[in-house]
Amino acid sequence: MSKEKFERSKPHVNVGTIGHVDHGKTTLTAAITTVLAKVYGGAAKDFAAIDNAPEEKERGITISTSHVEYDTPTRHYAHVDCPGHADYVKNMITGAAQMDGAILVVAATDGPMPQTREHILLSRQVGVPFIVVFMNKCDMVDDEELLELVEMEVRELLSEYDFPGDDLPVIQGSALKALEGDEEWSKKIVELADALDNYIPEPERDIDKPFIMPIEDVFSISGRGTVVTGRVERGIVRTGDECEIVGMKDTTKTTVTGVEMFRKLLDEGRAGENIGALLRGTKRDDVERGQVLAKPGTITPHTKFEAEVYVLSKDEGGRHTPFFKGYRPQFYFRTTDVTGAVELPEGVEMVMPGDNLKFVVDLIAPIAMDEGLRFAIREGGRTVGAGVVSKIMD
């Protein structure tokens, strides 16, 4: 184990492999850890260890995912790889594995296939910001022109879904040959790592983003005023900051006159911390669970949006029967349920358990939201689906 591993001073970037079944995602994942461990230090993981992905639960949904990590001289990467197509769908929609960028694996022997397209579309819908392409199995294609043709096809497909197909990096390689230790093909893995370093920008840390805290509880403290508690989702709030209370009803302004944690007064509350914020001039009844406390002007309330959704299968504890247009479940955002009506897309009559689709939701009360916000779909407190806001409409 190299000492490098525990250096947390390097920026941390989350990536993952996506692409069609059997195009070599897991082999590539193994090759990256193996080659980079040799070149830069770190731990190699073999194919079997990655392929045997443990099951995890995210919002009540079982997802099989493998997590590996590796280092380049300038960064530390956390990388996810999923065994099955359904796991990718669930992973990307629940946000279980938030990706700062994805490695799209396309076999040069096949070119783009149906799941290639599906994963690119999903990436677009759930807000994966950057894609780097690894054309795999290039050792099996002798014809230079054929390789060029496949690369062109992949670039066109990415452009179709509003990724910069002409400009993004495409590396031609062979994961298996690199994994077997072939020197020339191993260089392609290092080239891929360089592409990740140079093409995927360093993600903005949660703490540097504008302040937002979902409100979980509201108390009234006599002589001091109203306190709201919750876990700071992003940013920093300081004593004296003006904030907005957004969602459920009209947005109101307030000032934070104190921040406390474990009954101690602090100057500030930061992303990831559970805090209580004392609000000046805000009455106990003006605030409720489900609203957010946020930096003014950074988030707005909405009722109508388009969502990319995964509906739980019966085996996952979901519905046993399909639902139809006019379906009105609860949508659980951050800390609360809001009823909403589902508008199915043209030509879709019913939705079966286990389906993945996009539809429009109209909520009965506004929720503070941005595109990319995750939610659960519930019926009487039981999770029956998961979704992500792909487009705000109203």
UniProtKB/Swiss-Prot annotation:
Catalytic activity: GTP + H2O = GDP + phosphate + H(+)
Region (G2), start-end ranges: 60-64
GO molecular function list: GTP binding; GTPase activity; guanosine tetraphosphate binding; translation elongation factor activity
Pfam families: GTP_EFTU, GTP_EFTU_D2, GTP_EFTU_D3
EC number: 3.6.5.3
Binding annotation for Mg(2+): 26
Region annotation (G4) ranges: 136-139
Keyword Cell inner membrane belongs to the record: no
Region listing for G1, in residue ranges: 19-26
Job description of the protein: GTP hydrolase that promotes the GTP-dependent binding of aminoacyl-tRNA to the A-site of ribosomes during protein biosynthesis.
PANTHER family: ELONGATION FACTOR TU, MITOCHONDRIAL (PTHR43721:SF22), ELONGATION FACTOR TU-RELATED (PTHR43721)
Family the entry assigns: Belongs to the TRAFAC class translation factor GTPase superfamily. Classic translation factor GTPase family. EF-Tu/EF-1A subfamily.
Protein name (record): Elongation factor Tu
Originating organism: Idiomarina loihiensis (strain ATCC BAA-735 / DSM 15497 / L2-TR)
